[in-house]
Amino acid sequence: MMHTFLRRLCVVALCLGYIKASADFDCRRTSQSCVTGTCNDVNGDCDCPTDANGVATHRNADCGLEIAKVVPTALCGPPCLNGGECYEPTVGTYMCMCPEAFYGNKCENPRKKVECSGTEITINYMPIPTFSGDIFILDNRNTPECAFTEANGMYTATFTYQQCGVTTTNDQPNAGDTSYEISAAVRFNANIERATDMKLTAKCVIDGTGQSNLNDNIGTVSVDQRTDLTEETALTEYQPVSFQLQGKNGNPMPVPVNLGDELRIYIPLADTGRYTKLKITELQTNNGMVEQDLVMETLIFNGCLTDIGEALVTGDISSDPAIPAIIINFMAFRLRGSPQVKFDARVQVCEGTDTSCDSVVCPSPPQSVPSNPQNIPPANPQNIPPANPQNIPPANPQISPSSSQRKRRAAPDNEVILHETLTVLDPRSNEKLRLPHNKSDIKSQQNADPQQCLQSTEIMVMVIVLIVAVVLLLVITTCLAVKFMKQRAAQVKIYNPDMPTGNNTVRIPRAAC
């Protein structure tokens, strides 16, 4: 029995790569502010100060790490983990400066941690000091058995899979498995709910073979918009890079996106703990359709812009060595047959001594290449998958990732494949925001689209009839009121004190018109 219990017990710490101004830190939140520099009220980033030459003097999410005090990792004894950097705050004192997703002397502890057993789930969250807000299970804020307790800054909640609204899904992700999912809200001001609040979603998976493992998806979305937004998911597998679509200069992407809007692709390296350089080797785009309707173009091939890429990309492929990151500026476009633009990128990451990520000499004029030259697996046309550098999403949602990988060319260990999707509208036309669909989806989408209801002929006729009836009623009421006022004005009251009784009101005849 003990052996079975141990097989079903799993404790997995969340592994979040360092991304500047990630979900754990937002300078717009109460108790989270920039140590130096200024807070960007648009995206919650800290804009770090620079010297007279425009070179940054500080970095980290809160701009609290003075670059001049960063020292070799060896001086911190055992190296800093999870992207932490060794620095010297005072002469002869060496410490690890952790990314915002981790804490501890060596940055060894994740701020979000989930523990799963065969019967219960435990959520642990260590907020960035100084936290004075509130943490609670969604829809169970006042339920005692679902409450978080605080000890030394750590907030913890433990409950069974039958409590607190835990969602149970059988045969997921594989046949015989059981998945349990629960969400918590982190409110940084106990009395105010803002868009900068967080939603934590933990998911435990009990393997149908009797073994247990955890795939915890702890991401962040606005609590007050949690039904509208897609969670930014942090997987247990290490992701060295991410794919982000941004507005010009890194601003939030405009909504909606119209043809000609200035955008950029931003691919940052999560941290420099293992890899220090990156290079985009291929970038393809398609219209999200299937079979004969699929349109695909290659923008980057072998690290160089193609002829199509030269036409669509603004300037050259640039980089931000401070992160480091790849930046590709472009003006919003779309391909024939669909407003959706799907990007598939192949990115190579390198360690310090590896020269394969160095820049290459590109041909002139740019090369013309066939579509999908290296068979980059596109994102599922009917279901937008999250970026998963280690596991290429299967085209068939019913096929497990492991079986799908056996059918496709796997990416090398130092290469990741990323996917992202953008919807672009044409402001010159009166089109509506619709996703491409199969014929089998038409009926369900019509039922779900409120515009279909509003455009119903019968309802429009009824609305017009009601409007006409109301107008006629107002006209009739106005005429009656005017007639009554005229009758009152035509009467003159004459009072005669010599008349003992009777009606003292005399009607004066009016001249005929």
UniProtKB/Swiss-Prot annotation:
Glycosylation sites: 438, 503
GO cellular component: extracellular region
Residue ranges of domain ZP in the record: 115-364
Domain of life: Eukaryota
Species per Swiss-Prot/TrEMBL record: Lottia gigantea
Residue ranges of the region described as Disordered: 356-411
Residues of the signal peptide: 1-21
Record-linked InterPro entries: Cuticlin, EGF-like_dom, ZP_dom
Subcellular localization, as worded in the UniProt entry: Secreted
Protein's UniProt name: EGF-like domain-containing protein 1
Cysteine pairings via disulfide bonds: 76-86, 80-96, 98-107
Domain EGF-like: 72-108
Compositional bias per record (Pro residues), positions renumbered to this chain: 375-396
Keywords associated with the record: Disulfide bond, EGF-like domain, Glycoprotein, Secreted, Signal
Expressing tissues: Component of the acid-insoluble organic matrix of calcified layers of the shell (at protein level).
PROSITE patterns per the UniProt record, alphabetical: EGF_1, EGF_3, ZP_2
